Amino acid sequence: MSAANMPAGFTDYKVADISLAAWGRRETIIAESEMPALMGLRRKYLAEQPLKGAKILGCIHMTIQTAVLIETLVALGAEVRWSSCNIFSTQDQAAASIAAAGIPVFAWKGETEEEYEWCLEQTILKDGQPWDANMILDDGGDLTELLHKKYPQVLDRVHGVTEETTTGVHRLLDMLAKGELKVPAINVNDSVTKSKNDNKYGCRHSLNDAIKRGTDHLLSGKQALVIGYGDVGKGSAQSLRQEGMIVKVSEVDPICAMQACMDGFELVSPFIDGINDGTEASIDKALLGKIDLIVTTTGNVNVCDANMLKALKKRAVVCNIGHFDNEIDTAFMRKNWAWEEVKPQVHKVHRTGAGSFDPQNDDYLILLAEGRLVNLGNATGHPSRIMDGSFANQVLAQIFLFEQKFADLPAEKKAERLTVEVLPKKLDEEVALEMVRGFGGVVTQLTKQQADYIGVTVEGPFKPHAYRY
C-alpha cells in the first residue's frame, strides 16, 4: 500500500517519511513469503478471528518483519497501536507502510531519548487519553514498566503481556518477585522456536553483517572477544568464526563456559584470575591489548567497563548485541572521551580526553550503534525466516492470554493467575512444524507402538518440559 491509498483523514501516526510506504509494502510482500509459520497462522485462524475485540499496545523493533506480525494480528481481529523498542532499529519504510495501512504507529530511525519516550506515550494514548487497550506486546519491558508506573488504570482492563526478549523477561520476573506485576505474562523469549532461532541462529546471521556494514573491515585473522555465551553469545561466536576470526569467549556461568570450551573457543577473562576489583590493576592488559573486536551479548550491566575500554587495542571495534546500551560503559566514554561521528551509528571515540580531538590521532575505539543493538543499528537485524518463529510465538501467546480473560476474573482468582510462564510445548511444536514445512522438510510420524514405548502421544508433545534442546 502506498501513501496515496492511506485512509482519508488518518493522522494517528508519526513516521520519518510516509512516501516510503510503497517501498515498505514491496519488502513486506517478500517477507511474507519467508515467514511460513506466521502466514500459516494467519490462514489457519482467519475465519475464527480469535483476536476479535483485542486492543494491543505493541512495542517492538519496527522492521519489515514486524510489519508482517502487525498485519497478522490485525487480520485475526485485533486493533493495535505501535512503537519501536529501540531508537535506532526502525526501518522507516516499514513504519511508513504500516501507517499507510491506517494502523497507528510512532517510530523512526534515529529517535532521541525524548522522542522515544514520546512514542511510547503515543502508543498508550489515543486523542490524548489512555486507549482502552486490553493486551500488551513488549520487547525489553519499557512499555510494560511505563504502564505500571504512569498508567496503572489501563492495566485494570489488560488480560496480559507477551514479552519478546531476555531483558524484558528478567524485568517481569523481578516485578513478580516484588509483588509489582499487575497482569500475567507469557515469556515468549524462552520458547524453543524463539530462543534457538532468534537468539542463536539469528545472531549467527546478523552480527557479522552489521559489523561489516558499519566498518567495511575484513574480519579474517583478527582477534575477537565475545562477552557471554548464552544463546546470543553462541550465535555471535559462530558468526565471527564464520568470518575467519580468532574468537575468545568470556563467561561467568560454569555451564556456559564449559559449552564454549567444548565448542572449541578459548575461554578467557578480561580480568586477572577472573576477578574484577574495580581497578585498572585487575585488568588483563596483555589480553585486551590484542583484541580487535569486542562484542557484548549478556543482557547484564557494565560487562565491558571503563577499565576494559581503556585497555583495549588502539582502533578496536566495540559493539553490543544485547538489548540495552548499558552493557558497555558508554556513559564513561561520553564523559571522558571525544566522539567523532564517521557516519550514522559509527563513531570514532578518541581516548585522548573529552572535547576536541586531532583527526589524525590513532588512539581511538570504533563504537557501533552507540552501544545499542548493533545488528539493528548498523544493519537490518535478523532475516525474515528467523523472525518467523519468534513472531508466530507472539501471535499464539496473544491468542492464549486473550482467551484467558484475566481482567474479567473476580479479584480473589487473579492472584493465583499472576505468573510469568512459557507457552505450552505443544504450541512450540506447532510453530516448529510450520517452519519445517516452509523449508520443504518432512517430519516422520511416530507409530503408536513407538509413542507408547517412550510415553508420549503420536501427536506430541514429544519431550518433557525439562528437556534442553
From Swiss-Prot:
It comes from Pseudomonas putida (strain ATCC 700007 / DSM 6899 / JCM 31910 / BCRC 17059 / LMG 24140 / F1). GO terms for molecular function: adenosylhomocysteinase activity. One of its GO terms (biological process) is L-homocysteine biosynthetic process. May play a key role in the regulation of the intracellular concentration of adenosylhomocysteine. This is Adenosylhomocysteinase. Substrate binds at residues 63, 139, 164, 194, 198. Its cofactor is NAD(+). Keywords: Cytoplasm, Hydrolase, NAD, One-carbon metabolism.
